[in-house]
Amino acid sequence: MIRNKKINFVRFLLFFCILASCGHPVKTNDYLLSFYDTTKNEYGYKDQNGAIIIPQGKYQFCFTDTFNTYAIVLKKNFGFVAINRQEKVLYKVFAFDNGPDYPSDGLFRMIENSKIGYADASTGKVLINPQFDCAFPFEEGEAKVSTHCKIQSNGEHSIWLSDNWYYIDKTGKRIKK
């Protein structure tokens, strides 16, 4: 009787281990690497074995050299965008200084419906929904933002003007200063 209980217990453990492993693929270094075709002056992405996954020329420029979960690319007639592994456009990336916004304090700015929000630089996930007319990069855990501002252009450069600036933390909550 004790022997049967032990055998049944071992069977249960074995069954549980097999069941627990189903549907949970083992995480590997599944990433893509950007490449540049010098003869055609075009960019694309290859896997670790050199197989072309995203053909060169599909995007004008690939800003993300190692494509894990998302990549920032320049899409013709669309601008700087974040795409996922299925090449779905996740959102537009805020344009800054002739390129996509740079990560600052782990976040970068993104745009949706002409409003600015913030995405996580590691995962590409939107952390603060787009709601600001003007938003500066995060520094030391806070960012200066406004929901009512105007853009004043000075030829090549422009500045944001607002009487309603305030600061937010990395969760999007207003900080009292």
Q: Where in the sequence are the language-model features?
A:
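Bacterial Sec-dependent N-terminal signal peptides
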Residues: 1-28
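Residue-level detector of conserved, function-critical positions
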Residues: 24-177
